Amino acid sequence: MKRLCSPVVVLFLILSGCISAPDNIRDVRELRQDHASYFTGITKSEDPLPAAVQTRMDEDYNTIYFSVWHQNRPFHALPDRVYHDFKKYSLKPGYGENKKLHPPSWLKKLQNNASLNNYPNTLSRGITTRNTNLRELPTSSPHFNSSDGDSSAWPFDNLQRSSVSANTPIFVCHVSADKSWALVETSFTYGWIPVEDFASVDDEFVKIWESGRFAVIIRDQTSILDKKDRFLVRGSVGHIFPFISNASDKMQLSVAVADRHGKAVIQRGFAPADAAAVKPLRFNPVNAAKIANEMIGEPYGWGGLYGNRDCSSMTRDFFTVFGIWLPRHSEDQVKEAGTYIDLRGLSPEEKERIILQKGVPYLSLLWRKGHVMLYIGPKGGRALIFHNIWGIRTKDLQGREGRKIIGQAVITTLQPGQELTNIDSSSGSFLDNIAAMSILAPSGRENPAK
């Protein structure tokens, strides 16, 4: 005689780990992870961002992007901020790559090497020659809040401020005592990078580099080669280079490399024609879907670690292709760009109604504390979003907190993981916590919910 498990027993087995839950949340399983599939014939013909407006936005982008070459003192890396970076880690030494607490000598050595008693000691211009990482302290070693855990240990290295692509303009503020690290600013933040990852630039280089048109990479992991097919640098969506010319199979770009004296020189580089575009790429639904599909399924990368993206670097790189400037931090992206709409204090139903009514697909950002999302449009009366997300908070029967790991860029509803039996709803649902929307398209536009 066969014995059947009751629903209660099955639920207990799932919660206790005896039966594996589905690897992906329901939204990822059931929603097509293809941006092109969400456009109707109407949306394909819409022009939410007039060409003249996009051109002005791109000009503003370039002005901000190159601003570091036209300053003579730190803008982001103010002394108090730099000193604070060391002070906060003196109070919380954290854990290293070996899952052991950093000894007090770890930070002391970094402080001595930083030699901040004469900060800033350099004040010069440069350009990155490699894809690199801006670190809060002059070290590649990590700092984790705990030795293990879904949100306090790997991959959440507190010292990772942001990745920076090759050939990004920088302002060099300070060089460490051993000359191996430099504290630099980009147009969007600051941090320490290895000195071998950048080269110095002079007035002539700046004049040449800033002149003319620019190209932007539109395919991840694109190898840019020299005229002899030798590797120069790897580009991904949102990386910018001066444009030289276009051919049927290749786009010719300017690439900055370091000479033996550490000075930047310009070489000609070549990218596949379908992997690059003249910046800005015209914004329309087809192109928006094409660029978003380049990022779909990409692994989550905290602060851009391992060449991947977190939520805000994904949105930032997406909009760079279209010449739309965004800050680096998720909250700043919503509060400092576009038309801000406060959603706090509203019911989940009211929030979704406003998002559907006022949101412009692929030109609107949604924000909850620590996370930014791209609104991509309606489906069946529900709003859909595209975001690179680490996971959904969970809590088991013993009250232990955890994460249902998603760990990639996905299309979901505003309630991802709502079907999880162990979802942690103590602080409200995902939609409950969405606090604001920013519309990057010209104001005054509303979209009927479909």
Predicted feature descriptions by range:
Residues 292, 302-333:
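Active-site nucleophilic cysteine motif
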Residues 22-147, 151-155, 162-166, 171-173, ...:
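Boundary regions of SH3-family modules and the immediately adjacent low-complexity/disordered segments
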Residues 2-10:
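Sec-dependent signal peptide recognition
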Residues 200-201, 221-267, 298-309, 367-418:
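Glycine-rich catalytic cores of cysteine/serine-nucleophile enzymes that process amide/ester linkages
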Residues 19-43, 48, 188, 196-216, ...:
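Aromatic- and glycine-rich peptidoglycan recognition patches
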Residues 157, 227-228, 274-279, 297-306, ...:
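Second-shell loop/turn segments in exported
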Residues 15-17:
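C-terminal motif of bacterial Sec signal peptides marking the signal peptidase cleavage site
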Residues 163, 327-396:
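...with weaker cross-activation on analogous glycine-rich loops/strands in unrelated enzymes
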